[in-house]
Amino acid sequence: KDYELAITNNIAGVATAIIILLIIGALSGIWMISGVVPTLIYYGMQIIHPSFFLASTCIICALISVMTGSSWTTIATIGIALMGIGKAQGFEDGWIAGAIISGAYFGDKISPLSETTILASSITDTPLFRHIRYMMITTVPSLIITLIIFTVAGLSHDASNTQHIAEVATALNEKFHITPWLLIVPVVTGILIARKVPSIVTLFLSTLLAGVFALIFQPELLQEISGVAVSGFDSLFKGLMMTVYGATNLHTDNAVLTDLIATRGMAGMMNTIWLILCAMCFGGAMTASGMLGSITSIFVRFMKKTVSV
């Protein structure tokens, strides 16, 4: 019973994180199929120069994360679009993901709206803005060094191949209905974030709105995903639900774009969720058996001074 209770309590503690991961999976699929991400990619490729893309991505994610106080929301929304822009401009996934995550977590650490920042200052009984000021001693130099690295990497990137970017833009136009109306979805999401609506509610409403826009602007794609020969609301709804929970692969004449618009929905988050559940089960068993306390006590004996800590 003790083991069962400890494991149950651990899993209950990460239930919110698991729900957020599932909604992020659904959001990433719906934002792609609805045309929101393709629209952001289409306009982003025309605005952001490849030489400064990585540094710009880091700064954009940092600013949004500071304003929202949520690195997860930043990565799940604007991060997806920036990943698409970077891949279209020929950058490797690792560089793009590094720029997105670096900016998002920097903003999260110094944002007065961040739950982790507020929690840390509360636990240590430190005024919030004093805590942020001390955090900036390490985070700001880290960000500056990171921006220098991303700038050098961006300037070293071959930005002369504009034909490739033009081909991706043309393929996007052929596959999706690109329209400024689709920008309403990220704008509404930004408003919800600014009004401090909880992350789960924000992501859910953003997914729901993108689903409505998918039915309006991308019915042909939903029909293709559903695999149903006869067009109708049932087939469109089936295509929408398949995008939410499973993998979707749409064929285009551009190999880069075909890979770019492939989504995995909620199913893409299952490996991470299984890992979290296994870790919680292991941690619960270690706690209930007393082994975790025994191991911790050994380390505590040596933590007598600041240097040893």
Q: Whereabouts are the PLM-identified features?
A:
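Transmembrane helix-loop junctions in multipass membrane proteins, especially transporters and channels
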Residues: I33, V37, S70-T74, A120, ...
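Short alpha-helical transmembrane interface motifs in multi-pass membrane proteins
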Residues: I24, G98-G103, Y134, A171-E174, ...
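Hydrophobic transmembrane alpha-helices of multi-pass small-molecule transporters
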Residues: K1-I19, I137-I145, D158-W274
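Membrane-embedded alpha-helical segments and adjacent helix-loop junctions characteristic
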Residues: D2-K87, G246-V309
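Juxtamembrane and boundary regions of transmembrane helices in multi-pass small-molecule transporters
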Residues: K109-A171, W181, A285
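Membrane-spanning helices that line or support transport/gating and their immediate boundary helices
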Residues: T39, Y43, Y105, K109-P112, ...
